[in-house]
From Swiss-Prot:
Binding site for substrate: 43, 193
Associated pathway: Cofactor biosynthesis; thiamine diphosphate biosynthesis; 4-methyl-5-(2-phosphoethyl)-thiazole from 5-(2-hydroxyethyl)-4-methylthiazole: step 1/1
Protein name per the record: Hydroxyethylthiazole kinase
Class of enzymatic activity (EC top level): transferase
Residues reported in the UniProt entry to bind ATP: 119, 166
Molecular function GO terms recorded: ATP binding; hydroxyethylthiazole kinase activity; magnesium ion binding
Top-level taxonomy: Archaea, Methanobacteriati, Methanobacteriota, Methanomada group, Methanococci
Length: 266
């Protein structure tokens, strides 16, 4: 994909600052992934500095993985500021559907903030879409590629955003077009935080292109990096380190050789 390759080069040339309000579990691995790729991470959630931090950031990533009574207002305030400043916002509704708090928090942010990309797995996106009411989404959280395509399309229309439903095949839609991406590796499921890292990488790309192409770019680049990492390190611990290495090593040529993307008009 030409635009993915070009976005990779543009990202490295501009070194976008990506503000992450993310969960404790993945802060380190997310920051390392962004650094390896060529972006600059900042993990900042203190209420008193949000206005300053969001104003200098190129994009905001909100990840609800470890919610509490202090972090929720911080996420909401940051999303409001970023919306007012027209900064791209990527929302990862981690665990939506598992508890009412997670689903409610994700839906509240979706309702008032101008979310550029909603990135989650099949069950998470199905949960927020079903709870929202107008469209029930799917009944089962089990992955099905055809249902994931419909889910991505319906979520994009319902929330007026780009929806990225990730799984064995990733599906990204703005409600009018759908990209299906087959890059990635099953070993990613054996390392915590890989989905969260993907979300933040989409955030980095959202600083250099529109939300639809940013989501596709992030998924392709992270997926190819995982594929290459597995060829050198087929075990979880060393695999994680090799993913960082390949995020650093991946270039336009490799993207053009390895990208597995199909585009569909709705």
């Amino acid at each position: 994909m030409d635009f993915v390759a070009k976005n990779l080069t543009k990202l490295r040339e501009t070194n976008p600052l990506v503000q992450n309000i993310t969960n404790y579990v993945v802060m380190n691995s997310t920051a390392n992934s962004l650094l390896a790729l060529g972006a600059s991470p900042v993990m900042a959630h203190a209420m008193d500095e949000l206005e300053e931090m969001v104003s200098i950031a190129s994009a905001l990533v909100v990840n609800i993985g470890t919610l509490d009574e202090y972090w929720i207002p911080s996420m909401e305030k940051a999303a409001k500021i970023a919306s007012d400043l027209k900064k791209p916002i990527v929302l990862d509704p981690v665990g939506a559907g598992a508890t009412k708090l997670r689903t409610k928090t994700a839906l509240k942010i979706l309702d008032f903030a101008d979310i550029s990309v909603l990135r989650g797995n099949f069950g998470e996106i199905a949960a927020v879409l079903g709870e929202h009411g107008k469209t029930r989404g799917v009944d089962s959280a089990a992955y099905d590629s055809n249902e994931a395509i419909e889910l991505s399309k319906n979520a994009a229309k319902e929330f007026n955003t780009v929806s990225a439903v990730t799984g064995p095949v990733d599906h990204v839609s703005n409600g009018k077009e759908i990209y299906s991406i087959s890059n990635g590796h099953s070993m990613l499921s054996k390392v915590t935080g890989t989905g969260c890292a993907t979300t933040s990488i989409i955030g980095a790309f959202s600083a250099v292109d529109d939300p639809l192409k940013a989501a596709v770019s992030g998924l392709v680049v992270y997926g190819i990096s995982a594929e290459m990492a597995f060829t050198e390190a087929p075990y979880p611990g060393t695999f994680q380190a090799k993913v960082y290495d390949w995020l650093y090593r991946i270039d336009e040529k490799l993207v053009l050789e390895k990208a597995k993307v199909n585009k569909f008009e709705i």
